[in-house]
């Protein structure tokens, strides 16, 4: 009987440790940010993120194919016309990072930018 009690106690402790590690020590669920891309802008065109917090950017094109490249954060998306694409990443440095449309979308293509502010 004592042996069964010790085994149950040991298993309970292992389960508790596993549960604690997965909820406390693991990363938080990613924050989802929805963007809209249309000639020749992103909406919103500025986003503030926290360093070390995982993010999912979901970008929907309202018209033609677009892209989103943020070189410093290793984001490079191709968004089909009237479609959606997403990128998951965790910012590992602070600063202001400019993303640009990486798929030619018309005469205003060069001005299609978004700024991600990453703070502590």
List PLM regions with ranges:
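Bacterial N-terminal signal peptides
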Residues: 8-18
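N-terminal post-signal-peptidase region of extra-cytosolic proteins
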Residues: 37-45, 70-74, 82-86, 99-100
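Exposed beta-strand and adjacent loop surfaces of beta-rich binding modules
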Residues: 30-32, 54, 65-67, 96, ...
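N-terminal, post-signal-peptide region of Sec/Tat-exported proteins
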Residues: 48-83
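N-terminal edge beta-strand
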Residues: 28-54
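Extracellular/periplasmic metallocenter environments
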Residues: 20-22, 79-120
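Boundary of Sec targeting at the N-terminus
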Residues: 21-29
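Bacterial N-terminal signal peptides that target proteins for export
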Residues: 1-9
